[in-house]
Amino acid sequence: MSKSIEKFPKELVSPIAQLHSLVEKNSKLHIKELFAAEQDRFQNYSVKFDQLVFDYSKHRITKSVLEQLFALAKTKQLTHWIERLFSQDKVNCTEQRAAMHWALRLPSEYSKFPELTKQVHTQLQRMYALVEKIHAGQYRGATGEVIQDVVNIGVGGSDLGPQMVTHALCDFKVKTAKPLNVHFVSTMDGSQLSDLLHQLRPETTLFIISSKSFGTIDTLSNAQTVRQWLEKALGKHDRVVKSHFIGVSTKAEKMTEWGIAPENQLLLWDWVGGRYSLWSCIGFPIALTIGIDGFQQLLAGAHAVDEHFQNTSFEQNIPVLMALLGIWNNNFLNIQTHAVLPYDGRLKYFAAYLQQLEMESNGKSVQRDGQKVELDTCPIVWGEVGPNAQHAFYQLLHQGTQAVSCDFIAPIQRYNADHFTYVENAEALIEQHHLALSNCLAQSRLLAFGNEALDSAELKNLPIYKQYEGNQPSSTLLLKELNPYSLGMLIALYEHKVFVQSVIWNINPFDQWGVEKGKQIADQLLPILNGAQNDLSALDASTRGLIKILLGKVDG
C-alpha cells in the first residue's frame, strides 16, 4: 500500500493510539534487552496446550503491548465474531454464506447442531466405505483388476491441503491388501500428467476429480485428458468412467453429466471454502493414505483447537496470540513478510499450503462495509523446510535489510515408534533429528539475539561483515510428535489465526474475488491462440506483441 497511508489511523481508537505510542517509546528496544529485563520471559510468553507448545517470547513485545493488543481485539468485538463463526451466521458477507469448516470435524455425537452433524457424517461414512473397499482390494477397475494407484486431480484447496497432509503423514501410511500409491495432479499445462501417466497402468488406476464447483478448467482439462487415456486403452464404454472415476463436489448434477456413477459421488456444501476443505471428502486421498482411524484423529486434533479457540481467554488462546503478534509486526513494526520454517522434511508442503490459507483469505483491500481498507492487511507468506532454507535464504534473514518475522515448527520426538519401517536404523536417525532440532533452536536464537548469541571471545575481533544485528522476531511451535492428531491441531491454529486477523482488519477471509477475473480474461484469449479469432485490437500493446510471438507471426 501507499507509504502515505497509516498502518492504523492513530485517532480511531484508544488501543491503536496506545500501540503507536508504544512503538515510538520502544523503537530502539532490542529483543536481547527484553530477555535481560525479564528472567522468566519464556514462562511469561509461552503457552502449553495438549500436544504442543507455543513460544512467542522472541517477539518485540512487552506486557503493555500485549494488553493493548487484547484491548484492540475487544474493540473489534472479537469474542462476538468468534461466536458468529461457530454458529450458522453468514460471516462470508459477499457470498451470503456461512463458513462452517469447523462443522466438518464435529464428533458424530455432537448435539448442538444435530442436522448439520448428520449431513457431514453421512458423507464421511460414504467416503470411509470407499476407503475400506479400496484398501481391501475389493474395488476393481473395468477389467476386474484391483486398484493400486489413485490420482487426485484438483487445484488450490482441492490439491494443496490433501497433498500437504498426505506427505506430512507418510509415516502413518496403512497397509493394504495390495500396495496402494496416491498421486497428485494440479497444473493445467499437462506436464504433471505427462510424467505420471507413463508410470501407471490404466487397468489399475483410479482418478479422483476434486472440484467444489466441478467447473474449474484446470481440473476438468486434466480430467478430460485422463479420460481419453483410459478410453484409448480400455475402450469407450460407460463402465470405464464409472469404474475409474470418483467425484468430490457440491454439484451432483455436473458429476452425473460427466459420467461419474452416483455411488462414486461424494458431496460438499457451499459453506465450505476450498482452502478450508481438507477435513471433508476433499480429504479422500488423506484417508486412503493414513486410513479411517488416522483421518478421524486428524479431525479430532482440529476439533480440540476449535474448542480451545472458543473457550480460552485471549491471554492463553494460541490462535488469538498468533494473530495479534502478526498484527503488531505488520501494522505497527512495519514487518510485512513472514517466513514459515518447519524443521521436519515431512512438512515440505506446509508453507505452500499456508500461502493459500493466509494470502487468499486475507489478501484483501476492501472492508466488509465496502470501503477501502485504511491499513495494510496480509503480509507476504513464504517459507521452506528449515534445513534447506538455511542454504537458500537465511543469509537475507540474518544480514539483509528486510525485517522478517518467522514461525519455527518442529516435533519434539521422532523415530521412536516401533511400527515405522526405519526402526532398525532408529538410533542414527534420532541423532539426525537432534541435529535438526539444534539447528532450529540455533537459528531462532541467532535471529533474535544477533551478536549476543556469539561467543564473546569470537566477537572481539569479528569483522563487521560477519556480525549479526538480530532483533528479527519469531515464534516457535513444538509438537509432541508429528502425527494425525497434532497436525490437525497445527492446521486449525493457522485457520483461526487467519480469522482473528480478518476481524481486526474488518475484511472477509472467506471469498477470493481477486482470482476470478484473470480466468475470464484467459477464456477471452484462448480463441485467439487456437486460431478461432483474429481481432487483437481490443488488447494492450504488450499482450498483442506477445500473442503475435506465440502465433509465430513475428520472431521471438
UniProtKB/Swiss-Prot annotation:
Belongs to the GPI family. Keywords: Cytoplasm, Gluconeogenesis, Glycolysis, Isomerase. HAMAP family: G6P_isomerase. Pfam families: PGI. The active site is at residues 360, 391, 519. GO terms for molecular function: carbohydrate derivative binding; glucose-6-phosphate isomerase activity; monosaccharide binding. It is found in: Cytoplasm. It catalyses: alpha-D-glucose 6-phosphate = beta-D-fructose 6-phosphate. Pathway: Carbohydrate biosynthesis; gluconeogenesis; Carbohydrate degradation; glycolysis; D-glyceraldehyde 3-phosphate and glycerone phosphate from D-glucose: step 2/4. Its main location: cytoplasm. Catalyzes the reversible isomerization of glucose-6-phosphate to fructose-6-phosphate. Coiled coil: none annotated. Its EC number is 5.3.1.9. GO terms for biological process: gluconeogenesis; glucose 6-phosphate metabolic process; glycolytic process. One of its GO terms (cellular component) is cytosol. This is Glucose-6-phosphate isomerase. It comes from Acinetobacter baumannii (strain ATCC 17978 / DSM 105126 / CIP 53.77 / LMG 1025 / NCDC KC755 / 5377).
